[in-house]
Amino acid sequence: MSDFLNKRFWKYRGKRIRPYMRNNVKLAGAIIFVPVFLLSMFLFWREQLIHFDLSQVIKNFEWNVPLIIKSVLCSVLIAVGSIVASYFLLFDSYKKILHRQKIAKMIFSNKFYEKENVKVRKIFSNETDSKEKITYFPRMYYQVKNNHIYIRIAMDMSRFQNRFLDLGKDLENGLFCDLVDKQMEEGFVCFKLLYDVKKNRISIDDAVAENGVLPLMKHISWQFDKLPHMLIAGGTGGGKTYFMLTIIKACVGLGADVRILDPKNADLADLEEVLPKKVYSQKNGILMCLRKSVDGMMERMDEMKQMSNYKTGENYAYLGLKPVFIFFDEYVAFMDLLDMKERNEALSYMKQLVMLGRQAGYFLVLGAQRPDAKYLADGIRDQFSFRVSLGLMSDTGYGMMFGDVEKAYVNKKETGRGYANVGTGSVLEFYSPIVPKGYDFMSSIKNALVGVEGAQATAVASGSVSDQTASGEGVSEANG
């Protein structure tokens, strides 16, 4: 019913931007200052005003200089103090006023309006004077809803229409927001922006995977069942390793089969202590893990079709199977170590995993300093539905990660901060989950693993699931 009314009757699109709003902050200040100043002056002069007699004032007029100075100074200070207090107490309202002022100024500075000179008669005179009159001002609307800012611009077939469609980057930079989405509505283009993205950062304890969804920020989640495979890029000190460890912890807590490939034998390789026979650092071991993962995926797909509850279009989760996550860190460095035959073999395995893995529940998470197309050829890179860059990157690096998108990239020296493409086509500012100083990943992953194994043992003992289903595999795979 609401859709019917919205389509055929009036629909609220936000507060319309008017020409006077280019002085919005000054007007808001004056609206606070003037009443407070006058009220304060009245309180100082109330005795004189209550007993005011015009004839006596004219006859015995004298300047009460001390009271005048005192009242004016105090009233000004009180009015200014009211403005300052309003700024802090009503900061959100101030930001809205400032945003509307910036948009109005953008309209004037870019000359997105039309005007003409008209003749007007002077007051108290028969002479005429020329005055500018705005004959066209674009219909732009500003709305704040659910922590997002919506800027709607009417597509009215004016000569500015094509330029309106390309305002996303200007709005993003000018309002210091993150462009989340751009969509066409009936007669309008709508820019959806998020202000102060950092406020949506979550703790590592909140990054808990469930039902095919892993929350990474309050407004960003990796829906790995729908958007399979993740590509993570980031230089030294960008927070890439901690981010991968955070995802590993969440996947272990989910009960997934986690396999780790770390050719540099660095931080991820230390997880051998808590994930025995699941961590590979040598060339032969990594190639073997990739090969056996592909074989296991193919066998699982065949097994799924033989299951009694198999249904066309459903995935591994529908059949009660656990996902398999393969974390491959510094894969570019690994590829550089291989000869041509081995490199083609590794690329073939990776291509099969990313092309066929979603249905069977096999997910690949690649980490590198930058995703060189040399080692992600044949469209493999396009199969990574969720992409994250952390730390400082060049424009070339951003281009490799996200392609040619309308985005104003800003580098900030903050660990765990970067950008993400979450499968919507838009690149969003991103902050990885907060990891407290001194956080022990080894013990937390070990505890998560113990909890999962205990829950699986209980489920098997009760007969609610089979031993195969609890392990997440329909076939036996060697991990040696």
UniProtKB/Swiss-Prot annotation:
Q: What is the annotated localization of this protein?
A: Cell membrane
Q: Which GO terms describe its molecular function?
A: ATP binding; DNA binding; DNA translocase activity
- Lipid bilayer topology: Multi-pass membrane protein
User: What InterPro entries does UniProt report for this protein, alphabetically?
Assistant: FtsK/SpoIIIE/SftA, FtsK_dom, P-loop_NTPase
Entries under Gene3D superfamilies matching the protein: P-loop containing nucleotide triphosphate hydrolases
- The UniProt transmembrane annotation reads 25-45, 71-91
Q: Which GO terms describe its cellular component?
A: plasma membrane
Q: Does the keyword Transmembrane helix apply?
A: yes
Q: Which residues bind ATP?
A: G234, G235, T236, G237, G238, G239, K240, T241
| Keyword Mitochondrion listed | no
Q: Which UniProt keywords apply?
A: ATP-binding, Cell membrane, Membrane, Nucleotide-binding, Transmembrane, Transmembrane helix
User: Which positions make up the signal peptide?
Assistant: none
Residue stretches making up the FtsK domain? 217-399
Q: What name is this protein filed under?
A: Ftsk domain-containing protein YdcQ
Taxonomic source organism: Bacillus subtilis (strain 168)
Show the taxonomic lineage.
Bacteria, Bacillati, Bacillota, Bacilli, Bacillales
Q: Which gene encodes it?
A: ydcQ
